[in-house]
């Protein structure tokens, strides 16, 4: 049981790190001399030094992506806190339903954010000289891992 708890805890912390990095890092779209994330657009010199950064667009779809990414981080942190609370207060044989629900909500939020960004980013960047950055990919990787850990929490029973 201890190994199972350590495994699910490791998976949860990995999801949390993926969510934090994908929300914060400026690598959602990368192209010729520019990087874009949820918060700002940056142009870079040929040597890779940042020359100019300006705030991202105020379009509604981007604000919804920002909000759902923040919600996913909040739900995942709350889920981790609830897991520790339930670990010490739950009766023997009880399930971690609340923890699992919040982790599944975190997964659904990050999936919604990445899907909206995938569909709508072409309105923001009209040229096609870009590719998806590693933060965008980390967001998509966090989605199934968060769902998996949420499902494991729902199935998991507490033992002594």
Curated annotation (Swiss-Prot):
<dbReference type="GO" id="GO:0006915">
    <property type="term" value="P:apoptotic process"/>
</dbReference>
<dbReference type="GO" id="GO:0070842">
    <property type="term" value="P:aggresome assembly"/>
</dbReference>
<dbReference type="GO" id="GO:2001233">
    <property type="term" value="P:regulation of apoptotic signaling pathway"/>
</dbReference>
<dbReference type="GO" id="GO:0050727">
    <property type="term" value="P:regulation of inflammatory response"/>
</dbReference>
<dbReference type="GO" id="GO:0030291">
    <property type="term" value="F:protein serine/threonine kinase inhibitor activity"/>
</dbReference>
<dbReference type="GO" id="GO:0008285">
    <property type="term" value="P:negative regulation of cell population proliferation"/>
</dbReference>
<dbReference type="GO" id="GO:0006914">
    <property type="term" value="P:autophagy"/>
</dbReference>
<dbReference type="GO" id="GO:0043218">
    <property type="term" value="C:compact myelin"/>
</dbReference>
<dbReference type="GO" id="GO:0043256">
    <property type="term" value="C:laminin complex"/>
</dbReference>
<dbReference type="GO" id="GO:0043161">
    <property type="term" value="P:proteasome-mediated ubiquitin-dependent protein catabolic process"/>
</dbReference>
<dbReference type="GO" id="GO:0016020">
    <property type="term" value="C:membrane"/>
</dbReference>
<feature type="transmembrane region" description="Helical">
    <location>
        <begin position="134"/>
        <end position="156"/>
    </location>
</feature>
<dbReference type="GO" id="GO:0032288">
    <property type="term" value="P:myelin assembly"/>
</dbReference>
<dbReference type="InterPro" id="IPR003936">
    <property type="entry name" value="PMP22"/>
</dbReference>
<dbReference type="GO" id="GO:0034605">
    <property type="term" value="P:cellular response to heat"/>
</dbReference>
<dbReference type="GO" id="GO:0010468">
    <property type="term" value="P:regulation of gene expression"/>
</dbReference>
<dbReference type="GO" id="GO:0010977">
    <property type="term" value="P:negative regulation of neuron projection development"/>
</dbReference>
<dbReference type="GO" id="GO:0008203">
    <property type="term" value="P:cholesterol metabolic process"/>
</dbReference>
<dbReference type="InterPro" id="IPR050579">
    <property type="entry name" value="PMP-22/EMP/MP20-like"/>
</dbReference>
<dbReference type="GO" id="GO:0034620">
    <property type="term" value="P:cellular response to unfolded protein"/>
</dbReference>
<dbReference type="GO" id="GO:0034350">
    <property type="term" value="P:regulation of glial cell apoptotic process"/>
</dbReference>
<keyword id="KW-1003">Cell membrane</keyword>
<feature type="glycosylation site" description="N-linked (GlcNAc...) asparagine">
    <location>
        <position position="41"/>
    </location>
</feature>
<feature type="topological domain" description="Cytoplasmic">
    <location>
        <position position="1"/>
    </location>
</feature>
<protein>
    <recommendedName>
        <fullName>Peripheral myelin protein 22</fullName>
    </recommendedName>
</protein>
<dbReference type="Pfam" id="PF00822">
    <property type="entry name" value="PMP22_Claudin"/>
</dbReference>
<feature type="transmembrane region" description="Helical">
    <location>
        <begin position="2"/>
        <end position="31"/>
    </location>
</feature>
<feature type="topological domain" description="Extracellular">
    <location>
        <begin position="32"/>
        <end position="64"/>
    </location>
</feature>
<comment type="similarity">
    <text>Belongs to the PMP-22/EMP/MP20 family.</text>
</comment>
<dbReference type="GO" id="GO:0051146">
    <property type="term" value="P:striated muscle cell differentiation"/>
</dbReference>
<dbReference type="GO" id="GO:0007422">
    <property type="term" value="P:peripheral nervous system development"/>
</dbReference>
<dbReference type="GO" id="GO:0060005">
    <property type="term" value="P:vestibular reflex"/>
</dbReference>
<dbReference type="GO" id="GO:0007155">
    <property type="term" value="P:cell adhesion"/>
</dbReference>
<dbReference type="GO" id="GO:0030154">
    <property type="term" value="P:cell differentiation"/>
</dbReference>
<dbReference type="GO" id="GO:0071711">
    <property type="term" value="P:basement membrane organization"/>
</dbReference>
<dbReference type="GO" id="GO:0010624">
    <property type="term" value="P:regulation of Schwann cell proliferation"/>
</dbReference>
<dbReference type="GO" id="GO:0022011">
    <property type="term" value="P:myelination in peripheral nervous system"/>
</dbReference>
<dbReference type="GO" id="GO:0005886">
    <property type="term" value="C:plasma membrane"/>
</dbReference>
<dbReference type="GO" id="GO:0019226">
    <property type="term" value="P:transmission of nerve impulse"/>
</dbReference>
<dbReference type="GO" id="GO:0010498">
    <property type="term" value="P:proteasomal protein catabolic process"/>
</dbReference>
<dbReference type="GO" id="GO:0050905">
    <property type="term" value="P:neuromuscular process"/>
</dbReference>
<dbReference type="GO" id="GO:0009986">
    <property type="term" value="C:cell surface"/>
</dbReference>
